[in-house]
Every structure is written in structure tokens, then in C-alpha cells.
Swiss-Prot record:
One Pfam family recorded for the sequence: DUF3410
Major site of localization recorded for this protein: cytoplasm
Name of the molecule in the record: Erythronate-4-phosphate dehydrogenase
One Gene Ontology MF term: NAD binding
Keyword Amino-acid biosynthesis: no
Lineage start: Bacteria, Pseudomonadati, Pseudomonadota, Gammaproteobacteria, Enterobacterales
Residues at which substrate binds: S45, T66, Y259
Length: 372
């Protein structure tokens, strides 16, 4: 079987190479003439899959190592009997830890405590729900907006309308797919009206899709002097992004929130598992063989938000990724290369923390660290 994969996806040869002919290439360069004799295509969100790409191909199976599938024409695949699998939830831990890392970084810089803030979470799927759980473990007040989930889960008291959530939140974080149609389209859902309604000195975080926020409206309101702290991991028109907007944001990164080592392994392992099921191939790979067993140990004598911030930075300092984007954005393929050659970043569970206190250990465990 012939397999073509994005060269930035790890472990493709290790997982698929023993019984197949595997090739890798730049995901943006994948074209129709490369797919004529290919059976399996493994991609990221930068590859647009539609009739123009597949019309003359022999593709039977497509795996995308992403939660969202807005880059794939699902109707075309269904009509042509092409199996498509994605990895919803595989990057949830990584994105949530990125969001928390940015919040703790801002808290240290601006001298505030998260427990004194209200966090509004827009989109309560795999990522939004996990963020809700993590913040709750620290006693942080949260409000939720998800018109689809709230219809099914009426027990939570945190559900709010979008207008109320925006007006009552000190921190607004977005975890929605990019949609253009339906009852609640998310394209440009954060526009001038929403930005005007944000309280002064609030924090806006987007790790979903760039076009969920109208970047022109955001730049205009920042230029007018409104005080909003902005965290952007995703941008309209990636890999091109607004350099003026980058100059205003507090943290700007190259769409790497979901790029922890563990999340990337989870994603490609799920694609491999689905591939094995679909083609009835024996699954030969386990987690340990992919190098996920390494762990570090640290003991702490007390637990507060300052200690938690130090623990987070032992694993991941988000400001380094901000500096990397600012230093490389003007270079040839700078944005793409930051993603393609992203550093070896672990999740918090790779740090074993012992606070010598069962209650504190329970908090640390619920927040994502390994504990005794």
C-alpha cells in the first residue's frame, strides 16, 4: 500500500513503514498529480482536501491529525466512498495547558490571581470542557457558552447567553470549530460588537481557528486604544498574518497550542489505529514504544498560584514561542517552519509533583500534573 504523509507529522515511518511504501512531503505542496497511485493520505489542517485534489486519485483513506475538519470536503469523500478520520480530543490537554500557561504568565506579569477572575469559555467540546474542569480544580469562576451543548446539558448553572458571558467575563477564551452556516456560525463571531462589549483590561484568547475572530476589527479596536490583553495562537489567512496585529498582542504564537509531544503522538496513533481497523491490519504499536514513559520528579513544600506557575514553567514557557514567532515571521516560510520543526514540548503530566500533602496533591492531579 502506498502512503503519502505531511512531513511534519511524527512517527509516520515507525507506524506505517514496515508493511507499506511511505513518502512524506510539505503539506502545502500536496497536489493532485502526487496522489494518482496513493492509497492513504495523512495530513494536517494546512492541506485542503476537495474534488480538485482527489478527482484523479486512488485514495481510499484520509487521516487528518486535527480536531476540526473544515479543511476537508466531507460530502465529496462520502460520495466517493473515501474513509476520513480525524482526531477530536487528541490535542485537548495540550491546548488547555497552553491556555493556562498564558493565563499564569499574564498573572505573573500583571500581578493578579486567577481565583479573582471570571473566565468565559466559548465552546464546551473536548477542549472547552477540559479547561472548565481544570479551572474548577483551582476554584476559578467560569461561565460557559455553547448553544448546542446547553440544550442537552441543562444541569450546569454556568451556561450563559453570549452577550451576558462577554459582559461578565474578565477572560474570554474560544474553543469552537470554524463554521460558516447553520444556526450559530462561528466565522467572525468575535467582531466589533463583541469586542466593544468586552470589559476594559479583559483578556481575549483564541486557540481555535483564526477566522473566528475578525482580525481587522480586533486590530482597529486595539489601535483606538481599548485596553484588551490579547493571546492569539491562530490567525486569519495563515501562514500570512497581520504584522500590525502581531505588534499589539501580548502573546502571539504560530498555531502550536495543540503541539505538545503527547498530543502529536495521540493524534498519529489514533490515525494508525483507525487505519488498522479499516484495512484489517494487525496493530503492532504501543504507547511505551513511542517514548511516552519519561517523567521528572519535584517536591514542593506549599501550594499556591505562584508555585503552580513555577511548575508550569518547568515544563513549558509560552513566552519563548511568542519570541520565536516575532523573530521568524518575516523569514521565508517562517510561520510554517515554526510549526514543522516545533520544539520538544511535554505536557504537565510529565512532571511528578509531591507536595507532601494529600489535599494539595489532589489539586495538582486534577490540574494535570502527575502526583504520588
Amino acid at each position: 500500500m502506498r502512503i503519502l504523509a505531511d512531513q511534519a507529522i511524527p512517527y509516520v515511518y515507525k507506524l506505517f513503514g514496515s508493511d507499506n511504501y511511505v513518502q512524506v512531503c510539505d503539506g502545502r505542496s500536496i497536489s493532485a498529480n502526487m496522489l494518482k497511485d496513493v492509497d492513504v493520505l495523512i495530513i494536517r489542517s494546512i492541506t485542503k482536501v476537495n474534488h480538485m485534489l482527489l478527482y484523479d486519485s486512488s485514495i481510499k483513506f484520509i487521516g487528518t491529525v486535527t480536531s476540526g475538519v473544515d479543511h476537508i470536503d466531507q460530502n465529496y469523500l462520502k460520495n466517493n466512498n473515501i474513509r476520513c478520520v480525524s482526531t477530536p480530543g487528541s490535542n485537548a490537554v495540550s491546548v488547555v495547558e497552553y491556555v493556562c500557561a498564558t493565563l499564569f504568565w499574564l498573572a505573573q506579569r500583571d500581578c493578579f490571581f486567577l481565583r479573582d477572575k471570571t473566565v468565559g469559555i466559548i465552546g464546551v467540546g473536548n477542549i472547552g470542557n477540559l479547561l472548565y474542569q481544570r479551572l474548577n480544580s483551582l476554584g476559578v469562576h467560569t461561565l460557559l457558552y455553547d448553544p448546542y451543548k446547553s440544550k442537552c446539558d441543562t444541569d450546569r448553572m454556568s451556561w450563559k447567553s453570549l452577550d451576558i458571558l462577554v459582559s461578565k467575563s474578565d477572560i474570554l477564551t474560544l474553543h469552537v470549530p470554524l463554521t460558516y452556516t447553520g444556526a450559530y456560525p462561528t466565522w467572525h463571531m468575535i467582531n466589533k460588537d463583541i469586542l466593544d462589549a468586552l470589559p476594559s483590561n479583559s483578556i481575549l484568547i483564541n486557540t481555535s481557528r483564526g477566522a473566528v475572530v475578525n482580525n481587522d476589527d480586533l486590530l482597529a479596536i486595539l489601535r483606538c486604544g481599548k485596553k484588551i490583553n490579547v493571546i492569539l495562537d491562530v490567525w486569519e489567512s495563515e501562514p500570512k498574518l497581520s504584522l500590525p496585529l502581531l505588534s499589539y498582542v501580548d502573546i502571539g504564537t504560530a498555531h502550536i497550542a495543540g503541539y505538545s509531544f503527547e498530543s502529536r503522538i495521540r493524534s498519529i496513533k489514533k490515525i494508525y489505529d483507525d487505519y488498522c481497523d479499516y484495512f484489517n491490519v494487525k496493530n503492532k504499536v504501543n504507547w511505551i514504544s513511542l517514548g511516552l514513559s519519561d517523567i521528572r520528579y519535584i517536591a514542593v513544600s506549599r501550594l499556591d498560584e505562584c508555585i503552580i506557575n513555577r511548575l508550569i514553567q518547568l515544563v513549558y514557557n509560552v513566552y519563548y514561542d511568542h519570541i520565536a514567532l516575532k523573530n521568524n515571521v518575516l523569514r521565508l516560510r517562517g510561520f510554517d517552519k515554526l510549526r514543522e520543526y516545533y520544539c520538544f514540548r511535554r505536557e504537565w503530566s510529565s512532571l511528578l509533583v509531591d507536595s507532601k500533602n494529600g489535599y494539595n496533591n489532589d489539586i495538582l492531579f486534577k490540574f494535570g500534573f502527575s502526583t504520588l
